[in-house]
Amino acid sequence: MKFLPPPLYLIDNQLVTKYNKMIEESTYYYRLAEWTLLQELYGETWITTTTANYSIKNFSVCKSSGRLDAEYYQPKYDELFSRLSKFECDTIKDIASIKKSVEPGSEAYQDSGIPFVRVSDVTKFGISEPNVFLSPNDFSLKELQPKKDTILLSKDGSVGIAYKVEEDMNCITSGALLHLSVFNQDYTLDYLTLVLNSIVVQMQAERDSNGAIIQHWKPSEIEQVIIPQLPKPIQETISAKIQESFALRAESKRLLDEAKMMVEKEIEKRYIS
């Protein structure tokens, strides 16, 4: 059997152009949402202005925080909390309940079964197909699967990655991914997820996990993370931009899958016996 490679004309240029345009628009709307958030919080001065790389603290402050490492007390963190103090805020424990998943260990990994999602599979834009699986006989999917509107938040490795689950998922997540179930109605889910991925929370994660050889963000520290509560209309404006971004990204994926199927069908036709 002989195989001939598909010619270039099999690739629909209009489809490719449309795909690229949608990705660009998706990125634009997401960045617009980020810009709106930072504009509301920082105005025109959201980039830190301090040039000092040290601060002076009383020992009582160090004793209270339980941290003696100098990195924890950098002026940029003081500047962040000073800015947040100008807004109504809540800690994560006052916004969402936190549920831990499981960490079965590599010895439990299989080539088939229940998909096992790890931190490396998650970005703020979605979850890629896992290449590791767990036995359905050893783990309860019903208890551990991410449910619709749950926010996944990474606490180990690449800490502080947040993703809002769009629909119930047929998978189990790593213990390094916390499940946040929001109960505080003062926050829209898309707004909260954006804040978790923003510099506002990333700096708090950096502050808490500084000095560790392997980054680890303790759930007790995550509970105390400060979230600014912007007025609901502003949250809804930000959420609309996020939703538009994700809708465009989903449509671009559909187009890409369609293009792949077209090429695969043409390749099959070009097999010559």
Language-model segment annotations:
Residues F116-R118, I151-S154:
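Short hydrophobic-aromatic micro-motifs
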Residues L144, S154-V195:
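A short beta-sheet element
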Residues L189-Q202, R207:
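Glycine- and charge-enriched low-complexity intrinsically disordered segments
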Residues S140-L141, E167, A212:
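A structural connector/turn signal
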Residues T49-A52, P104-G113, R207-S209:
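Short coil/turn segments at secondary-structure boundaries
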Residues F3-V102, K232-S273:
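Non-catalytic DNA-recognition/assembly elements of restriction-modification systems
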Residues M1-D12, C171-L178, G211-I234:
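A short glycine-rich beta-alpha junction/loop motif
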Residues C89-G105, S120-K148:
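Sequence-specific dsDNA recognition surfaces
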